[in-house]
Design a protein with these regions (language model features):
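Non-catalytic interfacial helical region
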Residues: 64-167
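Short amphipathic alpha-helical molecular recognition features
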Residues: 3-7, 13-20, 46, 70-75, ...
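Short, conserved catalytic or adaptor-binding loops enriched in Gly and charged residues
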Residues: 5, 59, 144-147
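Residue-level signature of catalytic and energy-coupling elements of molecular machines
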Residues: 15, 58, 162
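Short, well-ordered alpha-helices that flank and scaffold nucleotide-derived cofactor binding pockets
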Residues: 27, 55-59, 121
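Pre-Walker A (pre-P-loop) alpha-helix and adjacent loop at the N terminus of AAA/AAA+ ATPase modules
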Residues: 2-39, 85-92
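Walker A/P-loop
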Residues: 33-68
Length: 167
């Protein structure tokens, strides 16, 4: 088992730090239909709990997570294919879904022709919460996504918070 997977929190109560951002994330998912923005961008350094928070929420609340790593699907066609499939398919076990797009800052390379714009257009139509993670939102190619999303900041964990998690 990979070390990071072994020590990854499985429940929200196991996540250290970033309590306010996690609380706002939970509110967004639970009240998705009432939010004016249909997506959230979780911004913070690697290891701050962005992706773990989504999976812990899903585990506790019986949601299915459909994950796309943006660095693997960079162009318009591949993003449209994933999003259309995710938005239109029913869960095998009739669970509610979360669409997680990890590392959207990976969309800023030369091969990413139209990827961010396609994603921005599709996420407005989603019947499911779209959650994106990023280390940096200052990239100009992501401005359309950032404007259409609620942004929640995650701070780096302190050494004592990391110690609590490992202890």
């Amino acid at each position: 088992m990979i070390w990071a997977d072994k020590h990854s929190p499985k429940l929200l109560k196991d996540i250290k730090g970033n309590f306010m951002s996690i609380e706002l994330l939970v509110d967004f998912i639970k009240n998705f239909e009432r939010h004016p923005k249909k997506s959230v961008v979780l911004v913070g350094p690697t290891g701050s709990g962005k992706t773990s928070s989504v999976y812990a929420f899903a585990e506790e609340n019986n949601y299915e997570v459909l994950e796309l790593n943006a660095s693997d699907f960079r162009n318009k066609a591949s993003i449209e294919g994933f999003m259309n499939s995710a938005m239109n398919q029913m869960s095998l076990f009739m669970k509610p879904k979360i669409i997680l797009i990890d590392e959207i800052d990976g969309l800023s390379g030369m091969k990413d022709r139209g990827g961010a714009q396609a994603l921005a257009k599709l996420m407005e139509k989603s019947s499911f919460p779209v959650i994106m993670t990023a280390n940096d939102t200052e990239l100009s190619k992501l401005s359309t996504l950032i404007k259409k999303s609620k942004v929640l900041e995650f701070d780096a964990l302190t050494s004592s918070e990391v110690g609590e998690r490992l202890g």
